């Protein structure tokens, strides 16, 4: 399992490849520049459309109330931002943050067109170097984005720093399937069908191949839980969804 516990190494995984540390951000940016216009379709293809149910369940568990301040990291096209903006109301605030300008632009245009305005900010942000003061947010979410972060340990430490005491991190991410037969079927789909769907939908087989590989290289459920605790979180737990195709990790700062 590849983790970022030791950043003394000079290379890191980019899917199944090893690239120099400083190149991963650029390569990930290239992937999401390519898929930004078809991102929602991509999520449907990767999850059989079930990502909406996973996100809805995460939102219900968030406990967000009017007046809360939320940071939606790797916010993409704004699915979670939209839901949280409605829940925090006029007295709250949601920040849609993404390292990729193309994704921020798609999210901003989509939410503006849907009338989600007035309590949402948009920013290009690196999760490893958040520009917010300590103790700023009631909730930080990162949905289907942590696996693309170069230094996950640093990002988790930064998230912990900007959370208010009593605040919560929610990580919704593809994880390790717990049922052996389903795991084999999902692997076959990910590596044999998903890239071909990417070619068909977006004329981009390589980006979809990377996305499949990035899921395989992401820390498993227990490893990510341990990483959260080592980053400073006082409590961490996870909930498997769809037999572990996705896991929802939650961490609290007391």
From Swiss-Prot:
Decide whether keyword Transferase is in the record.
yes
Gene Ontology terms: biological process? aerobic respiration; menaquinone biosynthetic process; methylation
- Substrates-to-products reaction catalysed: a 2-demethylmenaquinol + S-adenosyl-L-methionine = a menaquinol + S-adenosyl-L-homocysteine + H(+); a 2-methoxy-6-(all-trans-polyprenyl)benzene-1,4-diol + S-adenosyl-L-methionine = a 5-methoxy-2-methyl-3-(all-trans-polyprenyl)benzene-1,4-diol + S-adenosyl-L-homocysteine + H(+)
Pathway named in the protein's UniProt entry: Quinol/quinone metabolism; menaquinone biosynthesis; menaquinol from 1,4-dihydroxy-2-naphthoate: step 2/2; Cofactor biosynthesis; ubiquinone biosynthesis
Show the disulfide pairing. Answer: none
Q: What does this protein do?
A: Methyltransferase required for the conversion of demethylmenaquinol (DMKH2) to menaquinol (MKH2) and the conversion of 2-polyprenyl-6-methoxy-1,4-benzoquinol (DDMQH2) to 2-polyprenyl-3-methyl-6-methoxy-1,4-benzoquinol (DMQH2).
According to UniProt, the name of this protein is Ubiquinone/menaquinone biosynthesis C-methyltransferase UbiE
Q: What species does this protein belong to?
A: Hydrogenovibrio crunogenus (strain DSM 25203 / XCL-2) (Thiomicrospira crunogena)
Q: Which gene encodes it?
A: ubiE
